[in-house]
Amino acid sequence: MPSQPFQDDGVVLETARPKVKPPKRYQVVLLNDDFTPMDFVVDVLTRFFGMDEAKANAVMLAVHTKGKGTCGVYSREVAEMKVMQVNQYAREHQHPLQCEMEVV
């Protein structure tokens, strides 16, 4: 491809290079509450986020001690789906566990 702009009858055409930003990423977080059992939180982390038992326990303890814990970082659509799935699963099992997403 020539480095010179294309010229024809005094008209100069230049190739526009759009500035494309990478899409935003979202972290999915679980919020602590005083009623959801710790083993249910571990179940959620293994079931919906594919964590092994050790990682799920570490995140569960972060939720318990710090008030919230990060489950993963995803595109907007994936994060929205995971939040919806976790919140629905918690309600079906009559737990007040809350899951949210935050821009990274």
Swiss-Prot record:
Biological process terms in GO annotation: protein catabolic process; proteolysis
Family under the similarity heading: Belongs to the ClpS family.
Protein role: Involved in the modulation of the specificity of the ClpAP-mediated ATP-dependent protein degradation.
Lineage: Bacteria, Pseudomonadati, Pseudomonadota, Gammaproteobacteria, Thiotrichales
Complexes and interactors: Binds to the N-terminal domain of the chaperone ClpA.
Signal peptide bounds: none
UniProt superkingdom: Bacteria
Name assigned to this protein: ATP-dependent Clp protease adapter protein ClpS
Pfam families registered for this protein in UniProt: ClpS
Gene: clpS
Classification via InterPro entries: ClpS, ClpS_core, Ribosomal_bL12_C/ClpS-like
